[in-house]
């Protein structure tokens, strides 16, 4: 155990000098004596000096304090003992329920599974949310990104997916709260507790008020716990299927940006760290499914100023199997979930994977919506009356489709007062197929707003007719 002493402190970055023959390796964890603070080595500057990031507040640190090299990277508890617990970036419990009774601890910096060990994802994962199941279906063992600006519903969508998938899914879940609001973390804990699935969820939080070092590493802590569940073989020699929820991946990038300049790196485009693509790749390449078990990850991605070409969301796009793009213009119409069906994509959109009926219905829905989008300018200038009969019909169907994409959420019951709806995939396909086939051309578009299946829309239309 070599010892060094602190020689410089700049915000979250601390320089420590060691004897030349015992300089720590990059990513080694150092413990500052008589404090709770852990430092992670980022660079070797020469002459025995290493530059580190503090995982915790550097208040109270001073020069010449002794830092001890632990000789290994940051290690966190893994295994069944983490389930039902809330931990911080170092795996320490923050739920006041005593120490974490874990049988093992793993380092958070690990290699991604080799190419031979990985297995492709083709099995569909039903979410019960119409617009997602139809337009950008998820794969079991795939990676999903929820893209959206501030206040368009990323976290609510994430919570609904957790509600619909994690509760129905018999496997285990890991939730990593990266730089988000503490209130949301608290809400999530109580949501899980109330629905009696807390004993299947491990929670790791590094919230907005934490120093950048914590926010930069907390995603890796959560991922390491998920990897353990995936890789640890049970009596049948198989790992588990794990759900990994990350809210929010953008804050991971942002924490890297905050420490990058302090580490002496030149900023790149828009002030991001020059290592942005590599940092994102290191995290994303580990979130994958192997022949042993699977990790299905759902990540919320904040889009700064609603600009999808910003380097951070643009870098994230490359790693995902499905992208769900939330649109402010759709949210402003009062249609929730505010998913943009023309901007959301999925690699599963292949007739050989999802079946011909699903694929054809989705394509026709997309064509109808695209036609409506093109006609919007004409409608704005000349009005609906100038359109041909065929175009009027397309517009009418597109508006019904838009409204039918809305649906009441279980997690929003408290605010909306209407009970949440889970719509099975076959009902979703049947409903949209009927709309594009013109079976419901006679119903008013308002009947399709905030309902579950197509039967509810028909029922709502009847009630509206009776009132009229």
Swiss-Prot record:
Note whether ATP-binding occurs among the keywords: yes
- Where does it primarily localize? membrane
Instruction: Quote the EC number.
Output: 7.1.2.2
Which SUPFAM superfamilies does the record cross-reference, listed alphabetically?
C-terminal domain of alpha and beta subunits of F1 ATP synthase, N-terminal domain of alpha and beta subunits of F1 ATP synthase, P-loop containing nucleoside triphosphate hydrolases
Q: Pfam families from the xrefs?
A: ATP-synt_ab (PF00006), ATP-synt_ab_N (PF02874), ATP-synt_VA_C (PF22919)
Under Gene Ontology molecular function, one entry of this record is: ATP binding
Q: Name the GO cellular-component terms.
A: plasma membrane; proton-transporting ATP synthase complex
| The reaction(s) this protein catalyses | ATP + H2O + 4 H(+)(in) = ADP + phosphate + 5 H(+)(out)
Residue sites binding ATP per the record: 148-155
Which domain of life does the protein's organism represent? Bacteria
Q: Name the keywords, alphabetized.
A: ATP synthesis, ATP-binding, Cell membrane, CF(1), Hydrogen ion transport, Ion transport, Membrane, Nucleotide-binding, Translocase, Transport
Where found in the cell? Cell membrane
Record keyword Ion transport present: yes
| Matches recorded under InterPro entries | AAA+_ATPase, ATP-synt_VA_C, ATP_synth_F1_bsu, ATPase_a/bsu_AS, ATPase_alpha/beta_chains, ATPase_F1/V1/A1_a/bsu_N, ATPase_F1/V1/A1_a/bsu_N_sf, ATPase_F1/V1/A1_a/bsu_nucl-bd
Q: Per UniProt, what is the membrane topology?
A: Peripheral membrane protein
Enzyme's top EC category = translocase
Quaternary structure, from the entry = F-type ATPases have 2 components, CF(1) - the catalytic core - and CF(0) - the membrane proton channel. CF(1) has five subunits: alpha(3), beta(3), gamma(1), delta(1), epsilon(1). CF(0) has three main subunits: a(1), b(2) and c(9-12). The alpha and beta chains form an alternating ring which encloses part of the gamma chain. CF(1) is attached to CF(0) by a central stalk formed by the gamma and epsilon chains, while a peripheral stalk is formed by the delta and b chains.
* Summary of the function given for this chain in its UniProt record: Produces ATP from ADP in the presence of a proton gradient across the membrane. The catalytic sites are hosted primarily by the beta subunits.
PANTHER family named among the record's database cross-references: ATP SYNTHASE, ATP SYNTHASE SUBUNIT BETA, MITOCHONDRIAL
Q: Which family does it belong to?
A: Belongs to the ATPase alpha/beta chains family.
Q: What is this protein called?
A: ATP synthase subunit beta
Q: What is the organism field in this record?
A: Stenotrophomonas maltophilia (strain K279a)
Q: What lineage is on file?
A: Bacteria, Pseudomonadati, Pseudomonadota, Gammaproteobacteria, Lysobacterales
Coding gene? atpD
């Amino acid at each position: 155990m070599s010892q060094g002493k602190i020689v410089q402190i700049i915000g979250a970055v601390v320089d420590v000098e060691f004897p030349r023959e015992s300089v720590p390796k990059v990513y080694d964890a150092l413990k500052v004596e008589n404090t709770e603070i852990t430092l992670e080595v980022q660079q070797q500057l020469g002459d025995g000096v290493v530059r580190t990031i503090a995982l915790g507040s550097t208040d109270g640190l001073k020069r010449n304090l002794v830092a001890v090299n632990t000789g290994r990277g940051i290690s966190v508890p893994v295994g069944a003992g983490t389930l039902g617990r809330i931990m911080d970036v170092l795996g320490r419990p923050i739920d006041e329920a005593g120490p974490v009774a874990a049988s093992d601890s793993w380092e958070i910096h690990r290699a991604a599974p080799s190419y031979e060990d990985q297995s492709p994802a083709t099995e569909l994962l039903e979410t019960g949310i119409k617009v997602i199941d139809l337009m950008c279906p998820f794969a079991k063992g795939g990676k999903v990104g929820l893209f959206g600006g501030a206040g368009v519903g990323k976290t609510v969508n994430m919570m609904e997916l957790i509600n619909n998938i994690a509760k129905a899914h018999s496997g285990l879940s890991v939730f990593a709260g990266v730089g988000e609001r503490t209130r949301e973390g608290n809400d999530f804990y109580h949501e899980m507790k109330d629905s009696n699935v807390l004993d299947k969820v491990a929670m790791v939080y590094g919230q907005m008020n934490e120093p950048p070092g914590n926010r930069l590493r907390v995603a890796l802590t959560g991922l390491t716990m998920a990897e353990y569940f995936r890789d640890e073989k049970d009596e049948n020699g198989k790992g588990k299927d794990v759900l990994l929820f990350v809210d929010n991946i953008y804050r991971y990038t942002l924490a890297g940006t905050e420490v990058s300049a302090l580490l002496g790196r030149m900023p790149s485009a828009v002030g991001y760290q020059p290592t942005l693509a590599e940092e994102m790749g290191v995290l994303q390449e580990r979130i994958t499914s192997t022949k042993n078990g699977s990790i299905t990850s759902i990540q919320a991605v904040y889009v700064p100023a609603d600009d999808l070409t910003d380097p951070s969301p643009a870098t994230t796009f490359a790693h995902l199997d499905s992208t769900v793009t939330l649109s402010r213009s759709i949210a402003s119409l009062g249609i929730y979930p505010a998913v943009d069906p023309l901007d959301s994509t999925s690699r599963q959109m292949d007739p050989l994977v999802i079946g011909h009926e699903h694929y054809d219905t989705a394509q026709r829905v997309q064509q109808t919506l695209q036609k409506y989008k093109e006609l919007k300018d004409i409608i704005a200038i000349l009005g609906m009356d100038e359109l041909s009969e065929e175009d009027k019909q397309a517009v009418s169907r597109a508006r019904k489709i838009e409204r039918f994409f809305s649906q009441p959420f279980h997690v929003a019951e408290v605010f909306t007062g209407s009970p949440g709806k889970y719509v099975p995939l076959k009902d979703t396909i049947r409903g949209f197929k009927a709309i594009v086939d013109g079976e419901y051309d006679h119903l008013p578009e308002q009947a399709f707003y905030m309902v579950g299946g197509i039967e509810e829309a028909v029922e709502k239309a009847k009630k509206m007719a009776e009132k009229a």
